[in-house]
């Protein structure tokens, strides 16, 4: 199903009080979403890993840009067949007119999806589709041979190559450039399986701006 109106949630997490306004993503209910965006201090935009940037995504970003609202992007459905992650990053920058910086990175996609490397925390988050959750968090040196014991030699080498390219192409993440809405951190995962969501939340509570008083 789809959301047809904004839902409000409040919860405590890691010593922080988090207020979430879950807005409709479908364009038929865009007015409610745009109105809600005027009341938030930061936004998380969910992008379908197969469809990429859609018309509604562009409109949401326009509102965030007008209000100078910091944005985090969550690329969803990595456990399904989809687009190349680097192509998605290029599209995000070109279509949303904002620089991006991946803070997690998928290890394969679709049926071969094994998890993500959490760049922000330097951890390997492994995914088992039969259990539909993070089954193991591993602190492993990306250059260590131990990496291959967890994800296989081929995927280990591909991950090393991808992370090297990321470090070469994208600037090191700086919190202030995010808070000033110049850079959008990007996370990958599968919301349906609750995979990658906690990693995003762990980062969000540390970097998102505190609520500002409304006028």
Residues of each region from the PLM?
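Structural and coupling elements of P-loop NTPases
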Residues: 1-215
């Amino acid at each position: 199903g789809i959301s047809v109106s904004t839902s409000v949630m409040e919860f405590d997490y890691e010593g922080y009080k988090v207020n979430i306004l879950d807005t409709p993503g479908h364009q038929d209910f865009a007015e409610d979403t745009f109105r809600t965006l005027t009341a938030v201090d930061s936004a998380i935009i969910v992008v379908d890993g197969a469809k990429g940037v859609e018309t509604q995504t562009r409109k949401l970003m326009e509102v965030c840009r007008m209000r100078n609202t910091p944005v985090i992007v969550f690329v969803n459905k990595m456990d399904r067949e989809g687009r190349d992650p680097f192509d998605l990053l290029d599209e995000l920058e070109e279509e949303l007119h904002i620089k991006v910086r991946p803070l997690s990175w998928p290890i394969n996609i679709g049926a071969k999806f094994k998890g993500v490397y959490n760049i922000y925390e330097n951890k390997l988050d492994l995914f088992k589709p039969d259990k539909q959750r993070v089954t193991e968090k591993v602190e492993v040196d990306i250059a260590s041979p131990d990496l291959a014991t967890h994800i296989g030699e081929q995927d280990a080498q591909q991950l090393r190559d991808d992370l090297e390219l990321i470090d070469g192409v994208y600037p090191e993440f700086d919190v202030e450039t995010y808070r000033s809405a110049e850079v959008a951190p990007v996370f990958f995962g599968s919301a349906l399986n609750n995979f990658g969501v906690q990693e995003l939340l762990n980062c969000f509570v540390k970097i998102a701006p505190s609520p500002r008083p409304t006028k």
